[in-house]
Amino acid sequence: MAVYTDINEVDLKDFLAHYDTGELLSFKGIAEGVENSNFLLHTTKGALILTLYEKRVEKDDLPFFLGLMHHLSAKGLNCPLPLPRKDGALLGELSGRPAALISFLEGMWLRKPETQHCRAVGEALATMHLAAEGFALRRDNALDLAGWQALWPKARARADEVSPGLKAEIDAELVHLAGQWPKDLPAGVIHADLFPDNVFFLGDQLSGLIDFYFACNDFLAYDLSICLNAWCFEKDGSYNITKGKAMIDGYLAVRSLSPAEVAAMPVLCRGSALRFLLTRLYDWLTTPEGAMVVKKEPLEYLRKLRFHQAVETAAEYGWPQ
C-alpha cells in the first residue's frame, strides 16, 4: 500500500456520503506498497480501507479484482470485501481517481516469518487456487514473460547505474527464459503478489490474504514460485530450505502438483525472481521524489535470481523425494 494522490477531508466526506459508513472520525495515508494510494479510515461504524487506483492498475481490470474478492469470500477464504455504494456500485471517484472502500481485515503482517508461517502460507495459497475455480471473469497476466520483455527497455538504459553489468545479465536471462518457459501447465487464478505484507496473522494463526491487484490467470505453480522467493530467503540472501519445505508441504496438503509442474519449478523461480527484479528496478528509477511510498531495493532479487540459476531440480527447494 502507498500514497501517490493526496485527499482532503471535504472531498472525502462527499465521497463517503454515497456509502453507509457512518460519520468520518479520522483518516491517514498508508505508506507501505507501491501500486495504489491507500488510506486507513476510522468511522462511527468501524475501520475501513480507502483505495485510489492508479499507476499500473487499469480501470477496466477493477471488476475482475473486486469480483474476485467477493468470489473468494463466498468460498470461505478470509479476504477483504469491497463495500457497495448506496446505488449498488463498487466503484466511485475521488481526487480524479477510481476509488473503492474495502473492509478492514484484522491482523498484522509478519516482519520475521518462521517455518510454521511458511507452511500456513502454502496451505492458504493452494486453498485460494481451489477457491478461485469457477470464477467467471478472466484477466491475462500483464507481467508475464511478454510483459517483462516490454518493461525491460524502460529501465535498461540506466540499469548499470544500479549495478555494473546488470544490463547484460538481464539481457541474457530474458533470452534464456524465452527459450525455456513452460507452455502447458495447470492454470487458473493466481494472487501473483503474496508477499509477507499481503498476509495477515493474528498470533501464529493466518487471518487472511489481502491486495489482489496483481491477481490474474496464469500457471498455478508460478504463484508458488513467487511465494518461495518472497518467504524462504534469509536477510543474508541464503535460501532456507526448511522454510521452503514447509511451504511446499503446506501447499501439497491442499493441492497436488503434476510432474510437469515440479520439473518446471527452477525455471518458474527464475522467472518470478526476474519479474520482481524488473519491476523494482523500474520503480527505483522512476518513482517521483516526495511520493509517500517505500521503494524496494531491486538487487535483493538479483541475488535470488543468481541462486535459482544454479538450481537443477525442485528437490533443492525442499520438494519431497
Curated annotation (Swiss-Prot):
The keyword Nucleotide-binding applies. CDD domains: HomoserineK_II (cd05153). It catalyses: L-homoserine + ATP = O-phospho-L-homoserine + ADP + H(+). Pathway: Amino-acid biosynthesis; L-threonine biosynthesis; L-threonine from L-aspartate: step 4/5. Its EC number is 2.7.1.39. Gene3D superfamilies: 3.90.1200.10, Phosphorylase Kinase, domain 1 (3.30.200.20). The keyword rRNA-binding does not apply. Keywords: Amino-acid biosynthesis, ATP-binding, Kinase, Nucleotide-binding, Threonine biosynthesis, Transferase. GO terms for biological process: threonine biosynthetic process. It holds the Pfam family APH. GO terms for molecular function: ATP binding; homoserine kinase activity. It is an enzyme of class 2 (transferase). Belongs to the pseudomonas-type ThrB family. This is Homoserine kinase. The lineage of its organism: Bacteria, Pseudomonadati, Pseudomonadota, Alphaproteobacteria, Hyphomicrobiales.
